[in-house]
Amino acid sequence: MESQQLSQHSHISHGSACASVTSKEVHTNQDPLDVSASKTEECEKASTKANSQQTTTPASSAVPENPHHASPQTAQSHSPQNGPYPQQCMMTQNQANPSGWSFYGHPSMIPYTPYQMSPMYFPPGPQSQFPQYPSSVGTPLSTPSPESGNTFTDSSSADSDMTSTKKYVRPPPMLTSPNDFPNWVKTYIKFLQNSNLGGIIPTVNGKPVRQITDDELTFLYNTFQIFAPSQFLPTWVKDILSVDYTDIMKILSKSIEKMQSDTQEANDIVTLANLQYNGSTPADAFETKVTNIIDRLNNNGIHINNKVACQLIMRGLSGEYKFLRYTRHRHLNMTVAELFLDIHAIYEEQQGSRNSKPNYRRNPSDEKNDSRSYTNTTKPKVIARNPQKTNNSKSKTARAHNVSTSNNSPSTDNDSISKSTTEPIQLNNKHDLHLRPETY
């Protein structure tokens, strides 16, 4: 009777599946098919736990006529919690949840190849400039799970596909705090460079080397969304995304500017701590250099007060400026401007003393005139020989005249002659030479 009732209801109802499920006789009597149905429900519960890494069939898949005869594999593929994969490029926030990567344990353990996140991001065609994603990583939802009996692609073949272009690229870690964003963005930029996307990263002037494509922008958005959850982003990043949620390039540009600012701050502190001044450069240039460093640090939130600044400046003074360490160290309220007044005073005094010393070069015409009026000590033979010859000739003439007069004079005796020959002869010349007769 029960089999006849079921056959009658099958012709009236819309389908045998609906009649067999809604019939009370099925529940009151123990049908052998109930055992397979209970197993099917257990398989459905087990499949909901594995749906985080497994995929579902497309919406166009055929529905079996009788669910009692449906296999466990078919029930797993049609999980009530997961529908067809949305055909869109943007990933949802649930995909960024680490629990969604139960097969790998954590997103950081997923082996990434250069510039790939999902096969749908790559332009179609055999001449794609980006390597395709292997079947073992980033599989679509239609792929059955390992528990269903089907295994993934062989690891050796997957390795050959992924290493044909480049080795695995390690993804950046998950951002867990807004304070860690400066360090995280450095690893994210490194990840883009290893993924053959270094040309789209902004340079020092804020412009990339080349124009970013739509596929690259999609990859940039999805990777940033996965590894940098919105609840852990800094306020300034959220402000940029509130205007345009896809403007990741602006976030990278601002981050690079902040990195350069941090590097400049470190360089300014090192420069200020190693100041050296001895007057070799103008005092104005030294003051401008120091004040600019202090102003930059103060504007960036690193406050340098007058006491610390004066101590750093005085520690680098040397030469005549060194005594300022001892004359100014007792003034507690001394400012940087007052210290530079003393430095300027010493520098101007040095410049004045240098200008007072004659350091001009004499003209050659002046040297010739001086050689004519003054005796040149470097050439004594040229200057002293000619006058000596003239004086000698004069002395011989005078001596002969004296001898002749002495012989002709009757009052002159031998004593006077001997006296005149023994006494030196006085010659009226400008050299005042004393000559003896014996020498001639």
Curated annotation (Swiss-Prot):
Gene that this polypeptide is encoded by? TY1A-JR2
**Protein name in the entry:** Transposon Ty1-JR2 Gag polyprotein
Localisation: Cytoplasm
Alphabetized, the UniProt keywords read: Cytoplasm, Phosphoprotein, RNA-binding, Transposable element
Q: Which residues carry this modification: Phosphoserine?
A: 416
List all Polar residues biased stretches: 48-60, 71-93, 127-152, 419-428
The segments labelled RNA-binding in the record are 299-401
Description of what induces expression: Ty1-JR2 is a highly expressed element. Induced under amino acid starvation conditions by GCN4.
One GO term of the cellular component aspect? cytoplasm
Q: Does the keyword Flavoprotein apply?
A: no
